[in-house]
Amino acid sequence: MRPSGARRTLALAALAALALTATAAAAPPDALAEPNGGRGTSEFRGVNWADPRDNFASDEVVPSGLSTDDDYATTYDVATGILSEFRTELGANTVRLPINPWTVGTDWWESYTGAIDAATDLGMKVILSYWEADDAKDGRVDDMAAFHQMWTTVAQEYGRNRFVYAEPMNEPFGYSLEEWVDLTSQFLADHRREIPRSRVVISGTGYNDDVTGVGAAPELRGTLLSLHFYGFWADHTTEAEWLANLLPRISPYAHRTIVDEAGAPMTIGLNYGNHEGNTSTAYLGALTRVARENAMGIVYWPGLRNGDSYSLTELVGPGDLAVTSESGLAQLRWGWGLLDTEPVNDDPPAPPGAPVQGVASGRCLDVPGWSTTPGTALDLWDCNGGGNQSWDVRADGTVTVYADMCLTASGAAGSAAVIADCDSSAAQRWTLAGDGTITTATTGLCLTAAGTGNGSAVRIEPCAGTDHQRWLVG
């Protein structure tokens, strides 16, 4: 059912509340005890393993590196290789995996369980979380009957597996606190025989961005809580500002809370050892400090997702992962409690660079989606100070972004301006003139904005003296 079907009448809500009260009263004392004995959640040192499309899907969710063409045995073997890399390269002991009704109880489920089983056989904790479909994204369960059947199947298969945790829904922003407590209370009642409360992870309200409401709900006592926290939610550039942003979202429930989504750009050359002066590095410094000082677990987003600039690893071969940011990993490992000394330094937090702003539009030369894929075509976007809008004009005529990718003319007049690995070719050399034009060194064609709005393409065209071909650097 769609959102209207998920709402309960007041009468049904009252009956459900009475039933839950009776269930709680009849439960043994340890059923409502603090998870982990109130010692915190730092035992969760994890990563998300995500579908390249993101986990919002109207079909099977397939984490990067897996394939719906593979059977159980092949999926198990492929997953074992990737999960083993999470353990050895990162130090992770937890993986968060997506599920939905197109995945659970289907032909793909018969194979996908190979990934879950591979993780538990390695002694890793697994958090299974429901994502809504990409054609809904209203923060509510898409179909309550399908949702219930999905979790019933999961509970029957993994409810008694001590390594597997159930997170009823990812980012339930479509529900009020009262509605969300009602839904998750019913979830606990429905699956109380298979899944103990101590292995149920209740998402915070909104975009999982605040756990104080669910933490205070007596109906949810004994459960774990999940928080999401991202650096693109604000523009703070100091660790102190991020601490002030984060702490009110948690207090006083840190001992029950896992930050099961948190991430920052890992493929653009940032130095996470310096926490001042850059939004992303200050954010990660604050997050890891709060986690370490409050014995909170972090499940990084994502450990692996093809094409995601936040991905902490990339696939470089079958079962072989490469770390994308050593400084980012070191800061995360410190937050996990795996390092004795925080890996800080005084080097600049970001590569050198400045915005390149179109005179006609007032918007900035932008790498869409923070992509690091060679051949990505550039466009215009509102200036935001991000690393994907920070360009370094070098003495050799190259213009770099992320420290090691170059502005490149992809072809003749009318072709796109793209990013590519720097290779010293003529297509990557530019001349910045006093009139604001940026021209290719060999052909004399001008860097040109096709329009003035967000998303306008940037191409190389014959110079015509228009403001669409004039740029302000810095």
Briefly describe each language-model feature range.
Residues T9, A27-T94:
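N-terminal carbohydrate-binding accessory modules
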